[in-house]
Swiss-Prot record:
Cofactor info, note text: Binds 2 magnesium or manganese ions per subunit.
Entry keyword set: ATP-binding, Cell shape, Cell wall biogenesis/degradation, Cytoplasm, Ligase, Magnesium, Manganese, Metal-binding, Nucleotide-binding, Peptidoglycan synthesis
Binding site for ATP: 129-184
Residues given in the record as Mg(2+) 2 binding sites: E265, N267
Keyword flag Cell wall biogenesis/degradation: yes
Protein name from the UniProt record: D-alanine--D-alanine ligase B
GO biological process, one term: peptidoglycan biosynthetic process
Single annotated GO MF: D-alanine-D-alanine ligase activity
């Protein structure tokens, strides 16, 4: 399609989520080509971003995951090159990649989040276990795909979970466990799509469950009552806007047994694999994967 020009699908990279990005990128590349788009794979771990200009690309479909591709670094470089790209800008990408600062912003805006504590080597781990109650989730602040996450179930295990998470990031958070159910809501442009309920066969929705297991159950529509579904979509859109997101993102949330919603995190470069959730939500609205890729590509911007 001439309207898009020559499109670079940025995929791979050198983060711990490289494998997932390559799977997502392969799907996007195939979909765009099937629609007549002059699309080409581009792995920034193999050549510099300056090659985008040198090779005559007109815009970028960013499907990199994790640090560099999703944390504002890439976005700043593309801005400097004057290269239009999909997804959030520099500020929103940087904030959303940082779970701690995301929580601070959402809390400041009055949006519901689980209780949490920032951990360091001097933390009173026993006191935090008592304060948050068990179980507790411990997470690196800037990793995605549940990498480095531990569910602490027994007293005295919090420090070890902190040490594990610190292998991936210097900033580590401990988060209150919310039972009841995990959900996600895709946002594209100004529209929040049908929520999805995630029912992992494993103890929680970890890396293997997200990308490789076939026994994770995804329910879309999620089965929420209409008024709760509307509330969830409204919160997802508010969360998206508070972070300054644009283009597309996916907002994850939890719901307790009483039906209260708690925002978890925002993913500004969602997966687009066969297991991924944004394509699933789009299908529920009658949007095929190939058309979804075009919808995302339509949001390219610079500045």
């Amino acid at each position: 399609m001439k309207q898009y020009g020559k499109v670079a699908v940025l995929m791979g990279g050198s983060s711990s989520e490289r494998e997932v990005s390559l799977m997502s990128g392969a799907g996007v590349l195939s979909a765009l080509r099937s629609k007549g788009v002059d699309a080409h794979g581009f792995d920034p771990s193999e050549k510099p971003l300056s090659a985008l200009k040198e090779e005559g690309f007109d815009c970028v479909f960013n499907i990199l995951h994790g640090p560099f591709g999703e944390d504002g670094t890439l976005q700043g470089a593309l801005e400097a090159l004057g290269m239009p790209y999909t997804g959030c800008g520099v500020m929103a990408s940087a904030i959303a990649m940082d779970k701690w600062r995301t929580k601070l912003l959402w809390k400041g805006a009055g949006l519901p989040i689980p209780a949490f504590e920032l951990l360091d080597e001097n933390s009173d781990f026993d006191a935090i276990e008592r304060q948050l109650g068990l179980p507790i989730f411990v997470k690196p602040s800037t990793e995605g795909s549940s990498i480095g996450v531990t569910k602490v179930k027994q007293p005295g295990e919090l420090r070890a979970a902190f040490e594990e998470a610190r292998k991936y990031d210097k900033v580590v958070i401990a988060e209150q466990f919310i039972g009841g159910g995990e959900y996600t809501c895709a946002v594209i442009g100004e529209t929040a799509y049908p929520t999805i309920k995630i029912e992992p066969a494993t103890e929680y929705y970890d890396y293997q469950a997200k990308y490789f297991r076939d026994d994770t159950v995804y329910r879309c529509p999620s089965g929420l009552a209409p008024e709760v579904e509307a509330r969830a979509r409204e919160l997802a859109l508010k969360a998206f806007k508070v972070l300054g997101c644009r283009g597309w993102s996916r907002v994850d949330f939890l719901m307790d047994e009483a039906g209260e919603i708690y925002l978890l995190e925002a993913n500004t470069s969602p997966g687009m694999t066969s297991h991924s959730l944004v394509p699933m939500a789009a299908r529920a609205e009658g949007i095929a994967y190939e058309d979804l890729c075009l919808k995302v590509l339509d949001t390219v911007h610079v500045g």
